[in-house]
Amino acid sequence: MLIKNVKVFTKDKKFKNGAIALSGDKIKAVYTEANMPDSDLEETIDGNGAYAIPGLIDLHFHGCKGDDFCDGTKEAIARIAEYEASIGVTAIAPATMTLPVEELEHILEVAVEYKKENTDKRRADLLGINMEGPFISPAKKGAQDERNIIPCNVEICERFLKASDGLVKFIGIAPEESEEAIDFIKSVKGKVNVSLAHTNADYKTAKAAFEAGANHAVHLYNAMPPFSHRAPGVVGAVYDCKHVM
C-alpha cells in the first residue's frame, strides 16, 4: 500500500511532499518527490496534503469528548481511546484524579479489564495509567479534592499496582508532605515511575526526592512553587537532574 500526497518528515528535519509505502502493518519506505515510486503499481490512499507523522503518545490527560477516565467504565475508556486515535494520538496513559483509595482501585481494575478485552485497532493503545493523586499537597491541589489527599504510603501504592496489574506507570507525590517520602521512593522506584506532582516542595526537598529515584515532574511550573533565582524550587531541581523527564 502507498499513502501518497502527504508531507513527510525527512532526515534534514524538514517536511517535504512525499509518500509512505506500507507492507502489512510496517513502514517499508518513505519517499519524497525526488524518488517517488510508480503509484500505479500499488494500492494507494490519497493523504490530501496532510502531515504524516508517527503516532503521538499522551502521558497526561484526564479525558475528552465528555468522558473522563475516572468515570470508571470500559465504555468511557473506549470512547476516549477512539477519539484520541482520530486526532493522531496512538497511545495513551490517562491520569487519575485524587479520589478515595477504594474508588481508585475500582477505576484501575476496570482499565485492566478494558485492556484485556479490547481488540479495536481504531482506538489508541492503553499503554499505562498516570496516577496524579492522592499523594499530593493540599497547598498545591489545584482542582483536586482536598478531602481525599493523603501522604505517600507504600502499602497503598502496592494496592494500586496490584489493582492495575502493572498498568500504573507513573505515581505522583508531594515529598514535603511525608517524612517517609524518601523511603517511599526507594521502595517503589523499581516498580513504577515516581513523579513530583502538585507539590509545594522547596529545592532541597525536590532534589533529595530526585536523587532517591523520582524521575518525572508533572506539568512543570504548574501546581508547584514559582521559580526564582533565590528559591529555585522544584523547577530548579528538575533542571539540575539530568535523569528527570
Predicted regions and their residues:
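Active-site core of metal-dependent hydrolases
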Residues: 162-245
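Active-site loop-to-helix "anion-binding N-cap" substructures in soluble metabolic enzymes
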Residues: 66-72, 86-88, 93-103, 223-231, ...
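Divalent metal-coordination and catalytic microenvironments
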Residues: 6, 20, 25, 49, ...
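Histidine-rich, glycine-flanked metal-binding segment
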Residues: 2, 8-53
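Divalent metal-dependent hydrolysis catalytic cores, especially in the metallo-beta-lactamase
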Residues: 62, 78-107, 123-137, 164-176, ...
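Conserved phosphate-binding/catalytic loop of the ribokinase/pfkB sugar-kinase fold
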Residues: 137-162
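Charged helix-capping and loop-helix junction motifs
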Residues: 73-76, 107-110, 153-155, 229-235
